[in-house]
From Swiss-Prot:
This is Transcriptional repressor NrdR. The keyword Cell cycle does not apply. It comes from the Bacteria. Belongs to the NrdR family. Binds 1 zinc ion. The lineage of its organism: Bacteria, Pseudomonadati, Pseudomonadota, Gammaproteobacteria, Alteromonadales. GO terms for molecular function: ATP binding; DNA binding; zinc ion binding. A zinc finger (unnamed) spans 3-34. Keywords: ATP-binding, DNA-binding, Metal-binding, Nucleotide-binding, Repressor, Transcription, Transcription regulation, Zinc, Zinc-finger.
Amino acid sequence: MHCPFCTAKDTKVIDSRLVGGGHQVRRRRECNDCHERFTTFEGAELVMPRVIKQDGSREPFNEDKLLNGLNRALEKRPVSTEQVEEVVNIIKSQLRATGEREVSSHLVGECIMEALKKLDKVAYVRFASVYRSFEDIREFGEEIARLGE
């Protein structure tokens, strides 16, 4: 790897360790020419499946869309940024684990619902009310009752 300080082509790895739950490798490097030290992170480049929407159109998986939906449901809830990031990683892993090149938006929604149910029940109900398009208060009440079971 080139040194970011002097652009020399020869650097050596001083230390390596797993970070990010074992999904990344953090390496401390030192330039053989200028002796400056720097850190690099190495992670697998994983391809996410495309999403098939309800109207049949297809679009690339959009992590920002997932994060925005979660954040809207979790607004003013006692959930840390780290917990939200962990949920995003879990959902992405579940979608990749299908082994499919394309997944339905329904599957994405169900993965989100399952994750929110475990993380925060209020956020789950908020998300479910939009995702399932409750028609009246009765349907809303039934969903809340199912949470208590």
